[in-house]
Amino acid sequence: FSYRNYLSQKVFPNLDKDILDINNNYKPDLILLGHNNILQKNTLIELKKKGTKISLWYEDHVANYGPNWRNNLSLIEKNNDLIDTYFITTHPDVIRTKINKNKLNFLPIPVDKNIETLSIYKHKHRYKDLFFALSHGVNFGGLRQNTRDERENFLNNLVKLGKNINFHVLGINNDKPKWNYDLYKEMMICKMSLNLSRGKPLKYASSNRIASYVGNGILTFIDEKTKFHDFFSKNEMLFYKNEKDLAEQINNIKNDINRINKISANGKKRYFEIFNNLIISDSIIHKTLGSTQKYKY
């Protein structure tokens, strides 16, 4: 169940009591807190009495220059003496926190063959050059009002520089974000995509759109300051310095469909080789429980 049931719909009025009851029934080795940290301290103490490990994964910004980063960091720092491991979508080296650094681990956004099912590079009718979908949170129904989003400045500059580029940008000019298959349909008419997250580009930091793009086989551009070139070569992903450099790279490749398709296919293959859901799950279990790892990472 989702913790949001407790906070909004109040389907289960006694969250901590229910968690303790479930724990007594199943006696788990590991409890994984998914993008939340709302259990009371006494509840965590009780859960750990029989050796249960507690881990937390978190996707939002917890380093400077990202939206709401202070609140996000405060949230995960709560009860950090009782949480055994953390998995965050930014390299731990760039985070200043009271959490013991040995507990912090980088969490790549995983792909799943049952979700990232497309091979967009195989589609014949892709008449748009570059795809980008702007949103203010996963599955948030619309764009938040009165929210300053620096990505719009980046996109406006890019459009001005790319007069000969056929853009397909969703989520601006009051256009509501699209999700799931509706999003996939929009991606399938495009040759390339832009992975642009809110905030300052930081080492290994990315929103979960990167899995949707690369995992579905569409050539993806990402800021070189994220250092994703540690994982991907220029035959699997393309890296830009700024808006001008990005516009030049797009113009240089947009008519070379064979090269676009090759990079797209290579990127999808590589992403599934190193960041699929089985590997990421195994790394969480191994790093938290000390179990034998099944994969190299």
Indicate where each model-derived feature is located:
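Conserved acidic donor-binding segment of nucleotide-sugar-dependent glycosyltransferases
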Residues: 237-244, 252-257
